[in-house]
Amino acid sequence: MTWKKTNITIDGQTMEVPAPDIISASRCTDIPAFYADWFFQRLETGYSVWQNPFNGKRSYISYQNTRFIVFWSKNPKPLLPYLPYLKEKGIGCYIQFTLNDYEKDDLETGVQPLRERIETFKRLSCALGKEAVIWRFDPLILTDRITTSLLLEKIERIGTEIHDYTEKLVFSFADISNYKKVKANMIRSGIPYREWDEKSMEELAEKLSGLNQEKGWHLDLATCGEPIDLKKYKISHNRCIDGDLIARLTSDS
């Protein structure tokens, strides 16, 4: 991909830097949860700098051309005060909101209580429109206690609350063995995880699709980063940056 470029001047030094129209903030860290103030300060300043922790090299990005931001977060509540700023600047956004229910499983100890996260989801949906807040139950984790049936119960509990506040549910199947640090943490915490196989993926997909229809949610269902083809269950492959959705959300701007 070739980025648009622009010049910025810092401490008397002028340099050519990328100036994309669309910003992804961010899959590397939860910017909305932990760095919302910093991000919007940099947006106002017009650029950000990132230093590679391994070689110390600095990379810059300009916000001169920014017209749309895709946010990723488990707690986007700190974005709420900044939504008027985005509107004032003519910058659109949508939010990939990871809203899981592992509260009683010691798998997400650093997140806010589920009830508070659900309320944040609803507030964002009311502010931005339900098409602009995507529900991610990500990843789906199997353990000796968490079965596919229990996962479906967890999804149903949340879906009952928020199906009127979103249009889409995205999910993935946890590949614990592919992530050494995650695997080590699970073992250290005494959590006996289980890996997904194709049969269990198909079982969950079929039942999730049925749940979506039976409950009248009518959500678009999609997987994230999964090679398995689940089209027969009306489940598509998600796009991280969805050009069609961005076009919908900016059609009136």
Predicted regions and their residues:
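Short catalytic/ligand-binding loop motif for oxyanion handling, primarily in non-cytosolic enzymes
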Residues: 33, 104-105, 141-145, 177-180, ...
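Surface-exposed cleft-lining segments at the edges of enzyme active sites
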Residues: 103-111, 139-149, 187-196
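Conserved C-terminal portion of the radical SAM core fold
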Residues: 116-183, 206-216, 220-223
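Short, surface-exposed, charged loop/turn segments at secondary-structure junctions
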Residues: 182-191, 232-240
